[in-house]
Amino acid sequence: MSHEELAEVLAKVLKKRGAVLRGDFVLSSGRRSSVYIDMRRLLGDESSYSVALDLLLEVGGQDLARSSAVIGVATGGLPWAAMLALRLSKPLGYVRPERKGHGTLSQVEGDPPKGRVVVVDDVATTGTSIAKSIEVLRSNGYTVGTALVLVDRGEGAGELLARMGVRLVSVATLKTILEKLGWGGE
């Protein structure tokens, strides 16, 4: 499928689940937005998350196949990483935003094998959450070359990750999703 076709399919699923919301929202980056993509709404319908999973595999399949593990960014990326890992029979891990103060004190959970991993999140905005996860992974001996997301909001994530030597791969951009929904730009 072309990038346009992938975006069209994702836009339909997002519309079906009411996952593109208008209003006044504060994003995890701290930025305000009049549009919010709530990927968690896809999780409540197996046909919707199955389609989204297939789209992630379409754009990230080669990188995922070469990876030693799939790593989710807590919390939005964790369900997608888990489904990808299960589908591909790959080890799964996730990065906590902060080191916990009890138990093993680990920030990388699941003890996935060291090597080249793919980092997965649901939506990329500025890329700060993904970048922090990559820094934690690298400091723990992992190699990261690809971050995979369903939607790139186009607010700097790709550029930030590129400066770290990481390629951001997305199913669609927010701009394209809004165009496919007939909403125009944000």
Curated annotation (Swiss-Prot):
BP GO terms, sorted: 'de novo' UMP biosynthetic process; pyrimidine nucleobase biosynthetic process
Residues that, per the record, bind orotate: 125, 153
Catalytic function, reaction form: orotidine 5'-phosphate + diphosphate = orotate + 5-phospho-alpha-D-ribose 1-diphosphate
Assigned EC number: 2.4.2.10
Cofactors that this protein relies on: Mg(2+)
Amino acids binding 5-phospho-alpha-D-ribose 1-diphosphate: 96, 100, 102, 121-129
Pfam family of the protein (one): Pribosyltran
Keyword list, A-Z: Glycosyltransferase, Magnesium, Pyrimidine biosynthesis, Transferase
Pathway: Pyrimidine metabolism; UMP biosynthesis via de novo pathway; UMP from orotate: step 1/2
Broad EC category: transferase
Gene3D superfamilies named among the record's database cross-references: 3.40.50.2020
GO MF annotations, alphabetized: magnesium ion binding; orotate phosphoribosyltransferase activity
Annotated InterPro entries: OPRT, Or_phspho_trans_dom, PRibTrfase_dom, PRTase-like
PANTHER family: OROTATE PHOSPHORIBOSYLTRANSFERASE (PTHR19278), URIDINE 5'-MONOPHOSPHATE SYNTHASE (PTHR19278:SF9)
NCBIfam families: pyrE (TIGR00336)
Function in brief: Catalyzes the transfer of a ribosyl phosphate group from 5-phosphoribose 1-diphosphate to orotate, leading to the formation of orotidine monophosphate (OMP).
Protein family according to the UniProt entry: Belongs to the purine/pyrimidine phosphoribosyltransferase family. PyrE subfamily.
Subunit composition and interactions: Homodimer.
Protein name as annotated: Orotate phosphoribosyltransferase
UniProt organism field: Aeropyrum pernix (strain ATCC 700893 / DSM 11879 / JCM 9820 / NBRC 100138 / K1)
Lineage: Archaea, Thermoproteota, Thermoprotei, Desulfurococcales, Desulfurococcaceae
Name of the coding gene: pyrE
